[in-house]
Amino acid sequence: MTKYVFVTGGVVSSLGKGIAAASLAAILESRGLKVTLLKLDPYINVDPGTMSPFQHGEVFVTEDGAETDLDLGHYERFISTKMRKANNFTTGQIYESVIRKERRGDYLGKTVQVIPHITNEIQAFIERGAASATCGEPDVAIVEIGGTVGDIESLPFLEAARQMSLRLGRNSACFVHLTLVPYVATAGELKTKPTQHSVQKLREIGILPHVLLCRADRRIPDDESKKISMFSNVPEDAVISVWDADSIYKIPQMLHDQGLDRIICEELKLSPKDADLSMWSALVEKLENPKQEVTIGMVGKYVDLTESYKSLIEALRHASIHTSTKVNIEYIDSEELETNGVDSLKHLDAVLVPGGFGRRGTEGKIAAVRYARESKVPYLGICLGMQLAVIEFARDVVGLKQANSTEFDPDTPERVVALITEWYDREGKVETRTEESDLGGTMRLGSQRCPIKPGTMAEEIYGKDVNERHRHRYEVNNRFVPQLEAGGLIISARTPSEDLPEMMELPRSMHPWFVGVQFHPEFTSTPRDGHPLFKSFVEAALANKQARGVQA
């Protein structure tokens, strides 16, 4: 029978509930337990797919094509269990499901209310999400409840968790509360009152936390922990200090050293083997002791909010671990390149253009592509970054001066990149779309396997085929591919059913390392294994730095 750990947050948002939940999962997995995680989001949006990156940050895409919260990316990076659509749900999905049932008559004419109908539906979604785990029936399901205790949006989720813990009985569920202990510089001390009030708020709705994770910019002294314990009615050894760390991969060891996994296992009556965190220690050791260094420029329009590129940043960090290289990322606003030129790129060892949507800043990204191609600087284009590389090549090499994407210019006569109107989903069903289709849930989403052209750089990196995740509406237009190939561009991978270009590259006679991919490889990178594409990219950046005579 699956046991549940509910993770809540207090005082302020963005304390790191996702990292805390993922770190606990990593420790429990190292003890031989099968673990899955769920994220419950209190917003009314059905999913984050149409939300602004400035509002929500990155949209993480699962293997089965769900657009989910970025915390699911942390979950996959910390444990071996893969996430699915059922691992993340929102208030919007809950109400949508309940209203659909009401319209069908499932409630037999009863008045539909938050309690019991909404809370029952939340519990059903939680149990369904746990049961869908790719690891089989999990021993433990860790359920992260988004938002902050006291928010009206979170109340139905907290009530559902309370009811569920009561229904499951003792030793089947426990609560971990993450809260802030701020340091007040003028007083020169940490203040525990916000944590006391947060726990009181939780107790008012019937939830008694078993563990407090106290976030601070420094380790919390024992006397402050005793005070928190006394006022919150939580045992002193269960008041755990979580201070700022320079790497999230240090958090599992930090929590284990303070006995978090022991407390959870005792509360849930689990008797697994001892934790083995040697892998995490080895990763941190490599991360902190690089042998060389490179600087990679990430050219985008969301650079003021790096959460928009969370998985990409982590993928580069994983590559740094597996190449013993410190990777410095410089965030470059593509709109500034449009006005100030590309001089700010000249010191870079490599250029990366990530995915994105909309016309704003695209000409600046194209300028970055042109600079990388002409200067023989390693270039990696992801999703939109590949499309813009093709547009730049079409304009400046092939001579199609009006080449563009219909996303930016619907009337362009040279539609090098255009809307996909028909494709097959993961189940082999034909999906169709037009310019008038809804934005939500109408992209090509999820994993798709495709063969790689022999003799290409793509084959050197991936092998015979590639299986990566997608999130896009537009594709390179096959009508222009013969002209692009005549100019030297190589389409190194295509989808097997629709023959859509998946990867492009330039031959080494034209450029040492120039690759574009239509998919999002960052979603499958993990600190354990890294990712072959990002590893190759960092190695190319190193080679470029050494070729320029700069000490790596």
From Swiss-Prot:
Give residues annotated as binding L-glutamine.
Answer: G356, L384, G385, M386, Q387, E407, R473
**Which biological pathway?**
Pyrimidine metabolism; CTP biosynthesis via de novo pathway; CTP from UDP: step 2/2
Annotated region Amidoligase domain: where?
1-270
Which of this chain's residues are annotated to bind Mg(2+)? D71, E144
Which keywords belong to this entry?
A: ATP-binding, Glutamine amidotransferase, Ligase, Magnesium, Metal-binding, Nucleotide-binding, Pyrimidine biosynthesis
User: What InterPro entries does the database record attribute to this sequence?
Assistant: Class_I_gatase-like, CTP_synthase, CTP_synthase_N, GATASE, GATase1_CTP_Synthase, P-loop_NTPase
Q: Could you name the active-site residues?
A: C383 (nucleophile), H520, E522
Q: Which residues form the Glutamine amidotransferase type-1 domain?
A: 295-547
Binding residues for ATP, per the UniProt record? S14, L15, G16, K17, G18, I19, D71
Any GO CC annotation of this UniProt entry = cytosol
Give the UniProt record's GO annotations in the biological process aspect: 'de novo' CTP biosynthetic process; pyrimidine nucleobase biosynthetic process
Q: Name one GO molecular function term.
A: metal ion binding
List ligand-binding residues for CTP. Answer: S13, D151, I152, E153, K191, T192, K193, P194, T195, Q196, K227
- Which CDD domains does this entry report, sorted A to Z? CTPS_N, GATase1_CTP_Synthase
Q: How is its activity regulated?
A: Allosterically activated by GTP, when glutamine is the substrate; GTP has no effect on the reaction when ammonia is the substrate. The allosteric effector GTP functions by stabilizing the protein conformation that binds the tetrahedral intermediate(s) formed during glutamine hydrolysis. Inhibited by the product CTP, via allosteric rather than competitive inhibition.
> Reaction(s) catalyzed by this protein?
UTP + L-glutamine + ATP + H2O = CTP + L-glutamate + ADP + phosphate + 2 H(+); L-glutamine + H2O = L-glutamate + NH4(+); UTP + NH4(+) + ATP = CTP + ADP + phosphate + 2 H(+)
EC id: 6.3.4.2
Binding residue positions for UTP: S13, K191, T192, K193, P194, T195, Q196, K227
Assembly and oligomerization = Homotetramer.
The record's comment on protein family reads: Belongs to the CTP synthase family.
Q: What does this protein do?
A: Catalyzes the ATP-dependent amination of UTP to CTP with either L-glutamine or ammonia as the source of nitrogen. Regulates intracellular CTP levels through interactions with the four ribonucleotide triphosphates.
Q: What else is known?
A: CTPSs have evolved a hybrid strategy for distinguishing between UTP and CTP. The overlapping regions of the product feedback inhibitory and substrate sites recognize a common feature in both compounds, the triphosphate moiety. To differentiate isosteric substrate and product pyrimidine rings, an additional pocket far from the expected kinase/ligase catalytic site, specifically recognizes the cytosine and ribose portions of the product inhibitor.
For this entry, the protein name equals: CTP synthase
Organism equals Burkholderia orbicola (strain MC0-3)
Traced from the root, the source organism's taxonomic lineage reads: Bacteria, Pseudomonadati, Pseudomonadota, Betaproteobacteria, Burkholderiales
